[in-house]
Design a protein with these regions (language model features):
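Short amphipathic alpha-helices in soluble, non-transmembrane regions
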Residues: 13, 17, 67, 252-257, ...
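Conserved glycine-rich FAD pyrophosphate-binding loop
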Residues: 41-42, 46-47, 72, 79, ...
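Helix N-cap motif at beta-to-alpha junctions
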Residues: 57, 245-247, 304-311, 371-375, ...
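FAD-binding subdomain of flavoenzyme oxidoreductases
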Residues: 104-107, 116-256
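A conserved active-site cap/scaffold subdomain adjacent to cofactor or substrate pockets
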Residues: 236, 242, 291-329
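General beta-strand structural signal in soluble alpha/beta enzymes
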Residues: 26-30, 53-54, 74-78, 96-98, ...
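Short amphipathic alpha-helix segments
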Residues: 248-284, 375-391, 425-432
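N-terminal flexible segment immediately upstream of the FAD-binding catalytic core
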Residues: 1-65, 82-112, 147-155, 275-278, ...
Length: 489
């Protein structure tokens, strides 16, 4: 009988992997394993048995073959920056670190498309694109060290750019859990000239891609993808609207969005505004805490991009529209002198949660989508809940990226790892998530404990999902336990 991931089988796996990809690319030093055992989240750490670092598609295929043969679970990792336990391995599991696969393979400047490997970070893609007069779309809350490919795969439709939508990844190469290489969309047809064309009307592209969106490494390894880049404009300006009345937030956001002018748009509550628009000085956390009470309840921030004359017209149109509803277009945030400079820099090279975690040492996130109208209600409920359990409302940050249809919301609770807060926050997490679900929050990416919350309410959907998992990954070697809280299929 073969027992999943026993020490003997893992030893054999290490031996085979070392022969296939070189022993310097199979890491077993305890200090290095420890680094991969945890993330910024509240998820309990788990030490991997080894880290394998393949450098090519063929090497990944070999690793997958051995994992199947020896029933060793593997967890793909591209940037390693996700923060809800997505890359924490199961016992005796192996980390498949794809950072060595970090090449931009091709670019079509006229089409604004680049073909990238999973190890390409946002910073790298941004620098590469800028040399060709283009820019990469980066989500403001992520660190620039996140993998562009893995993030685009994971975010749609959680994150969206108000002007460009959420599907930035068009066609891709996937290594299925049995090692089969699959190309989606036009890439599947070598004779077709434009390998990146994504056609929703075709079952070969959109439909196929969706199976791997947000699959958290459970259905295969994405080894390449064509991603959209955008032009660099002559003029880029940042603007702000401050809002103190919850009832006006939806109206303001909608009016600005519906003009279809802003290219990047983010809404912050006062806590996240303080964290976002403050410089990372040694005093960062302390200064932030002092700032929060003096800031407006909400800050709506957006960029306008285009030719000088075009931007001028947009500015006057938006200013007029806002004036009509009693608001002003600002080019700075009162009390935050560097807001403009920081916003323009963050939309290209984001600092992400490592910066915000400096406020109280750590920060946990509840990501969901909801109607923009419901945001203030959910926010108030969360603040009350947090206060009832002895936390300050100054620890509750909210960042929203509005898209055409919904608000994409990240509720962030800052906490301190050194005092007894960790257990308390961990215990509250599920309860808060459940309460917010009742109020209209939808967890479109049910990570970790949220999987239980969501799938227990959608039995039929969950059964079909498990059927897909069983069909594609009969040995259950690909990042087990991510789609469910148990290892059973
Ligand atoms: C507004 C916002 C909110 C966010 N909220 C959260 C959040 O709440 N929790 C969170 O964890 N992240 C969150 N993210 C991060 C994001 O969704 C991705 O998890 C992250 O950007 C992935 O980048 P990474 O390179 O660090 O991936 P990694 O940390 O390396 O991996 C992320 C997940 O994808 C899988 N994976 C990685 N590479 C591949 C690959 N090549 N093929 C197949 N599977 C792969 C991994 O196994 C893992 O499950 C948020 C981002 C934004 C912008």
């Amino acid at each position: 009988m073969v027992v999943r991931g026993t020490i003997m089988l893992v030893d054999k796996f290490i031996d085979l992997a070392s022969k296939a990809i070189g022993d310097t690319n199979v890491i077993t030093y305890p200090k290095e394993l420890e680094k991969y055992s945890r993330d910024h989240s509240l998820v309990k750490p788990g030490i991997p048995s080894c880290i394998v670092r393949p450098g090519s598609v063929e090497e990944v295929q070999e690793i997958i073959e051995y994992a199947n043969k020896l029933l060793v679970p593997i967890t793909p990792l591209s940037g390693g920056t996700n923060n809800l336990g997505g890359t924490i391995p199961v016992p005796n599991g192996v980390i498949l670190d794809l950072k060595r696969m970090n090449r931009v393979l091709d670019i079509d400047v006229r089409a604004g498309m680049a073909s990238i490997q999973p190890g390409v970070t946002f910073e790298q893609l941004q620098e590469y694109a800028s040399k060709h007069g283009l820019r990469a779309l980066t989500p403001v809350e992520l660190p620039k060290t996140s993998s562009a490919l893995s993030t685009y795969l994971d975010l749609a439709p959680l994150y969206g750019w108000v002007y460009y939508g959420e599907e930035i990844l068009t066609t891709m190469t996937v290594l299925l859990p049995d090692g089969t290489l699959l190309k989606t969309g036009q890439q599947a047809f070598p004779q077709i000239k434009w390998p990146y064309v994504h056609s929703h009307a075709s079952p070969f592209a959109g439909l196929m891609n969706y199976i791997w969106y947000q699959s958290q490494g459970t259905l295969g390894v994405v080894a390449q993808g064509w991603v959209k880049l955008k032009p660099i404009h002559e003029v880029v300006e940042a603007f702000f609207v401050t809002v103190n009345d919850d009832n006006d937030l939806y109206k303001i956001a909608r009016e600005i969005m519906w003009m279809r002018y802003p290219r990047d748009m983010v809404i912050f509550n006062n806590v996240d505004a303080a964290l976002f628009f403050e410089d990372e000085t040694p005093n960062y956390g302390k200064k932030t805490a002092e700032l929060i009470p003096s800031l407006p309840k909400w800050v709506v921030a957006f960029t306008l991009r285009g030719r000088k004359e075009g931007v001028d017209i947009m500015v006057s149109d938006i200013a007029e529209k806002l004036q009509g509803i009693g608001y002003k277009l600002l080019d700075e945030v009162p009390g935050m002198p560097k807001a403009k400079e920081i916003f323009l820099s963050e939309v290209n090279y984001p600092s992400g949660w490592p910066k915000y975690s400096k406020y109280r040492g750590a920060r946990t996130i509840l990501p969901f989508i909801c109607s923009l109208k419901d945001v203030p209600i959910i926010h108030q409920a969360l603040k009350k809940f947090i206060e009832k359990h002895g936390f300050s409302t100054n620890y509750v940050g909210v960042t929203i990226t509005p898209t055409d249809r919904v608000g994409v919301v990240a509720c962030n609770v800052a906490f301190n790892r050194e005092i007894q807060e960790v257990d308390k926050i961990r215990n509250l997490y599920y309860e808060v998530a459940e309460e917010m679900l009742r109020l209209g929050a939808f967890y479109s990416r049910p990570y970790g404990i949220l999987a239980k919350l969501m799938y227990s309410r959608a039995q039929n959907y969950y059964e079909v999902l498990m059927k897909i998992k069983r069909t594609l990954d009969p040995n259950n070697i690909m990042n087990p336990r991510r789609l469910t809280l148990t290892e059973d299929l």
